[in-house]
């Protein structure tokens, strides 16, 4: 018999339901979580035994959206879901980041979390639902997990924090922040904001953490009812004697090695020390496990770096806690790109380009929440050579997608509106060197490249990565962390923004006990660092260039009568296709009659505008035009009068005397003056050569409506 156990509770304006025991009973744990018709089915499977020789924790989080959840069939050729989209990858990372630190150290059994979206309400994003589901499933499973966690989205509307805003509310919000944490501590923050202050951002984090306590309470209640017995797992006992022997051989040498400021030289020396230490110990006792020795050495490394920081000594590269590495900022480094910059901070370097395109270059995203068009693209590439390694090169990995998204969020707040700058913009960051905080180097480089491209961004933005070392009540916040400080520290805290405020905040915390005060110190220290970097960037370029690159397409805008759109497009697109080929431009027409002409050559754009104006010109009854004979028939001749308009001159209207044969008076291609006698309801035009020649006024070209033209 199926005996589902259900808990239901109010979460802000939404009702959340947790249900277990109904489906996937062979999984270690399974939960169906729903929030106002958005439902995510989350399963967890954990292996009871670790693989022999396993030296890392193999946690996999898969998040997958099924189109049936929105009542649709996939649009792909095979009509089924394929590889994860960028959005699915980002949500998988969002689930992974707060749960990973909650597994005990030394636990290396394989664990897989699969979250499947099975129903979606377009107003309720499935990401928070999936995070709650992962927390509940892990808590029910009995797998060693120091949860549960809660998750909340926080908006900021009319100077008020809003818990789990709907999609419509988010459009009005100055903030989109996701926070996750345990009952006692915040573990993860991901956000984008419209240049809010440090206090407003910190307030949002605290608000979200307070509100999500109801989620944690209800998961705990569900575990009491339906939870499986906790696994009898114990970490391997610590070999104190072996630890002491390894420390005696290596600690002093590693301490000296970590005074070498050059990364490659330091790594080489550390590798030598490790190799020699392991060789010495294996010579003494060949039964020792090499992996275990490596773990002990890593723990010593970590202790060396952390204890030095806590003692107030200089950091690995000799800096004080709040010092920024040396900066080198250059713009216009690539001659044929629309905008480019090379941003170097210590041993981290990003080559960033900005490319301008038309609306046709925008990315159309067919997402579960509905189709949308993205006119700002940000791609981050992290090749293996950036850290002096070899490796696979190809499609972006999860980390590259995540870093690109963070950098994009950082810049989004200062991008111009499409009606003021009607371009699709693509930014690409190539990480050419990396030793910590390459995503924030990408933000700085993007700001510089956009200004170099003449994109009228509202303000320059810069990003900085902060770190933390904490033992008991003693803690030190580090500015502009190195890769080693990120790896060996307790927090990775990235902040981006302008002089006015914060545009993005990302926080990953590896320990519990990070207080509001510590976050306040980190935010304030980050502000000082951000302003310092902006000052250096402004010396290279302090405002967007006055004009876009000569190699970028220039977009000219004119307005036509919406009723005339069909005339410009033509049957089956024939007219607009011919216009594009004739003028060498790209032409886009919107439903309100806005026409955008993109061309790298100003003369080509003017030619296209002139032709469109001719096509859309109103024919005035009683006016005389100069036309060209296009067709001769027994009863008269057809004459083109410009703009694709053609009218009939009846045989009786050719001359002021009887005409027996049309060809006696008119030849194909002949230019003749014609007067418009009538335009009937079907748009057919009656013309007269006879009346035109009788009039004394000179012939006129079709008159076009006044056009708005802008760049």
UniProtKB/Swiss-Prot annotation:
GO molecular function annotation: 3'-5'-RNA exonuclease activity; magnesium ion binding; polyribonucleotide nucleotidyltransferase activity; RNA binding
* Top EC class for this record: transferase
Task: Give the residue ranges for region: Disordered.
Answer: 689-711
Positions with biased composition (Low complexity): 694-711
Q: Which GO terms describe its cellular component?
A: cytosol
**Biological processes annotated in GO:** mRNA catabolic process; RNA processing
- Native organism is Shigella boydii serotype 4 (strain Sb227)
Pfam families in the cross-refs:
KH_1, PNPase, RNase_PH, RNase_PH_C, S1
Q: Which reaction does it catalyse?
A: RNA(n+1) + phosphate = RNA(n) + a ribonucleoside 5'-diphosphate
The entry assigns this protein to a family as follows:
Belongs to the polyribonucleotide nucleotidyltransferase family.
Cofactors that this protein relies on: Mg(2+)
Oligomer and partners: Component of the RNA degradosome, which is a multiprotein complex involved in RNA processing and mRNA degradation.
Cellular localization per UniProt: Cytoplasm
Biological role: Involved in mRNA degradation. Catalyzes the phosphorolysis of single-stranded polyribonucleotides processively in the 3'- to 5'-direction.
User: What's the protein here called?
Assistant: Polyribonucleotide nucleotidyltransferase
* Keywords per UniProt: Cytoplasm, Magnesium, Metal-binding, Nucleotidyltransferase, RNA-binding, Transferase
Q: Which InterPro entries match?
A: ExoRNase_PH_dom1, ExoRNase_PH_dom2, ExoRNase_PH_dom2_sf, KH_dom, KH_dom_type_1, KH_dom_type_1_sf, NA-bd_OB-fold, PNPase
> Which residues take part in binding Mg(2+)?
486, 492
Which domain of life does the protein's organism represent? Bacteria
């Amino acid at each position: 018999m199926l005996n589902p156990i259900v808990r239901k509770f109010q979460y802000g304006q939404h009702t959340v339901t947790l249900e277990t025991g109904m489906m996937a009973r062979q999984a270690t744990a399974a939960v169906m979580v729903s929030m106002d018709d958005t439902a995510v089915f989350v399963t967890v499977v954990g292996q009871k035994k670790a693989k022999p020789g396993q030296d890392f924790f193999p946690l996999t989080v898969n998040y997958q959206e099924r189109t049936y959840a929105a009542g649709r069939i996939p649009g792909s050729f095979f009509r089924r879901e394929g590889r994860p989209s960028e959005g699915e990858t980002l949500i998988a990372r969002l689930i992974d980041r707060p749960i990973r630190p909650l597994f005990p150290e030394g636990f290396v059994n394989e664990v897989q979390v699969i979250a499947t979206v099975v129903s979606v309400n377009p107003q309720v994003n499935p990401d928070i639902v999936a995070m709650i589901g992962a927390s509940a499933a892990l808590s029910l499973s009995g797998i060693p997990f120091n949860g549960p966690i809660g998750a909340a989205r926080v908006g900021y509307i009319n100077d008020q924090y809003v818990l789990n805003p709907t999609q419509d509310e988010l459009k009005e919000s100055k903030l989109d922040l996701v926070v996750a944490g345990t009952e006692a501590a915040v573990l993860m923050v991901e956000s984008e904001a419209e240049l809010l202050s440090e206090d407003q951002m910190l307030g949002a984090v605290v608000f979200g953490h307070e509100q999500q306590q109801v989620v944690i309470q209800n998961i705990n209640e569900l575990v009491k009812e339906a939870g499986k017995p906790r696994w009898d797992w114990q970490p391997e006992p610590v070999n104190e004697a072996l630890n002491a022997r390894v420390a005696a051989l290596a600690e002093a040498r590693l301490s000296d090695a970590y005074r070498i400021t050059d990364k490659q030289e330091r790594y080489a020396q550390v590798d030598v020390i490790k190799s020699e230490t392991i060789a010495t110990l294996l010579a003494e006792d060949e039964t020792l496990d090499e992996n275990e020795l490596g773990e002990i050495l890593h723990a010593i490394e970590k202790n060396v770096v952390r204890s030095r920081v806590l003692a107030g000594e200089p950091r690995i590269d000799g800096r004080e806690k709040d010092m920024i590495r040396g900066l080198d900022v250059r713009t216009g480094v690539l001659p044929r790109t629309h905008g480019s910059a090379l941003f170097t901070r210590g041993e981290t370097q990003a080559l960033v380009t900005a490319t301008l395109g038309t609306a046709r270059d925008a990315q159309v995203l067919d997402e579960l929440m509905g189709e949308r068009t993205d006119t700002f693209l940000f791609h981050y590439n992290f090749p293996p050579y950036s850290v002096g390694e070899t490796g696979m090169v190809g499609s972006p990995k999860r980390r590259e997608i995540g870093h690109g998204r963070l950098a994009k969020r950082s810049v989004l707040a200062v991008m111009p509106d499409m009606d003021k700058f009607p371009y699709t913009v693509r930014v690409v960051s190539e990480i050419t060197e990396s030793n910590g905080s390459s995503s924030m180097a990408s933000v700085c480089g993007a700001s510089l490249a956009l200004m170099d491209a003449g994109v009228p961004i509202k303000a320059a933005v810069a990003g900085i990565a902060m770190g933390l070392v904490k033992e008991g009540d003693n803690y030190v916040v580090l500015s502009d962390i190195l890769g080693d400080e990120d790896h060996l520290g307790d927090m990775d805290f990235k902040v981006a923004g302008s002089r006015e405020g914060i545009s993005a905040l990302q926080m990953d915390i590896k320990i519990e006990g990070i207080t509001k005060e510590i976050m306040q110190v980190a935010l304030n220290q980050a502000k000082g660092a951000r302003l310092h970097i902006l000052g250096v960037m402004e010396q290279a370029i302090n405002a967007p260039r006055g004009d876009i690159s000569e190699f970028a397409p220039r977009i000219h805008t004119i307005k036509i009568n919406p009723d005339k759109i069909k005339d410009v497009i033509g049957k089956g697109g024939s007219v607009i296709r011919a216009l594009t080929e004739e003028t060498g431009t790209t032409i886009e027409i919107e439903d309100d009659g806005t026409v955008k002409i993109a061309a790298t050559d100003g003369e080509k754009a003017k030619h296209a505008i002139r032709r469109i104006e001719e096509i859309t010109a109103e024919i005035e009854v009683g006016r005389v035009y100069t036309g060209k004979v296009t067709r001769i028939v027994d009863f008269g001749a057809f004459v083109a009068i410009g703009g694709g308009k053609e009218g009939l001159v009846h045989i009786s209207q050719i001359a002021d005397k009887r005409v027996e044969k049309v060809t006696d008076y008119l030849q194909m291609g002949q230019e003749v003056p014609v007067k418009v006698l009538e335009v009937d309801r079907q748009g057919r035009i009656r013309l007269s050569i006879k009346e035109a020649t009788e009039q004394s006024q000179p012939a006129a070209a079709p008159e076009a409506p006044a056009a708005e033209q802008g760049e």
